[in-house]
Amino acid sequence: MAGIPGLLFLLFLLLCAVGQVSPYSAPWKPTWPAYRLPVVLPQSTLSLAKPDFGAEAKLEVSSSCGPQCHKGTPLPTYEEAKQYLSYETLYANGSRTETQVGIYILSSSGGGAQHRDSGSSGKSRRKRQIYGYDSRFSIFGKDFLLNYPFSTSVKLSTGCTGTLVAEKHVLTAAHCIHDGKTYVKGTQKLRVGFLKPKFKDGGRGANDSTSAMPEKMKFQWIRVKRTHVPKGWIKGNANDIGMDYDYALLELKKPHKRKFMKIGVSPPAKQLPGGRIHFSGYDNDRPGNLVYRFCDVKDETYDLLYQQCDAQPGASGSGVYVRMWKRQQQKWERKIIGIFSGHQWVDMNGSPQDFNVAVRITPLKYAQICYWIKGNYLDCREG
């Protein structure tokens, strides 16, 4: 497997970002682009000492590095990308491992993977996450809550939100289970909550004759078997590179039996339908309610989407999705293209500006998360 210079690796990252087919099969049909996807495969795994689970759960993260700051940051080298995409796995018994990865590119024939190698904080402010009129919608009634796409949103026992992305897998934000130094309290016994009717008769008690009242719901919990967190988050906590990797995957102990939403590579903001994104989460100012919102993307970098969707702590970890045309299957399909991370106050031309931020699923992140889910890179060739 021949190595290539680091400059060529940077060129590959750029090609992954822009080297795609035209996103429109017709002016009124925004279409999922086709990307040339890399492969991220484990190279070696070593055991680590058990963590102390001493961190306090953070329902949001903040950063002073805004769009212009991030745009001025150089793309990672091959060695840096390998370091950031290496990951820790935490198991239900408290043990953990660290896995180093290699980055590959599929050969044009599709018969195998070619290795690509090389030669070698802000001012504190009160956080405001509601912009003008509160445009969030609380979702009521089992006919909505238990149906797609709202049924893909789940609650973490640490207080965040997650999204079902496979039969046994939940995508969420890394800061919901790890503060960048160690795992948060309760992560060893992490559970995922699924909304279901509180009563078997359809949502109301036997003595409740008020048909206009919404059905009462409760959470049914499933334990988590293991979690994956990228080292880019763990090693990046001292600076703003960590926010680019604020995502984690949870594997449940048993299948959830609900329809899930697939992940996809995030298209450029200008190719999103209406330039908008959507997500649903369990904002902590509306306890027990699933809250849906949509809004325009205001800015973007290679790794982040900046928007002003109304949100509160607790919504962190929500899957950011869009609905676009799938040319191969000739149908519309929603996909998760990012993970809602948190809130930022940044300096914009000398004036403070606040944003809510989502981590984009880039081609490399897609390859990593897909491998965590599938365990076979050949099943991860369509982003």
Curated annotation (Swiss-Prot):
Belongs to the peptidase S1 family. Residues 1-19 form the signal peptide. GO terms for molecular function: serine-type endopeptidase activity. The active site is at 175 (charge relay system), 240 (charge relay system), 316 (charge relay system). InterPro entries: Glutamyl_endopeptidase, Peptidase_S1_PA, Peptidase_S1_PA_chymotrypsin, Trypsin_dom, TRYPSIN_HIS. GO terms for cellular component: extracellular region. This is Serine protease 23.
